[in-house]
């Protein structure tokens, strides 16, 4: 079962009127444009903003939202999580940030790193 703090953090990225994630909310909270968010998610900007592709967009944005929600939960602050995501190199990845890894399709590695930090592997 998901941690209640994680569920609350993740819910901040959704639409209030639909069960889908909101690209606009995610881009605002992360401080990036929709075009930059589309590149991070690996979809076109048109796909990101089109209503017909909501499920595809959810699938593309879910790893990013999981990362941001987890980082927010751990840092206690959504803004610090966004700054960490964009600017803090992750140990062992040659100076790459979480944003760099997500952009190259390695969101799962970032999630594994966050889980390791949560478990006390990295201090």
Feature roles, as predicted:
Residues 1-123:
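Non-transmembrane "mature" sequence context
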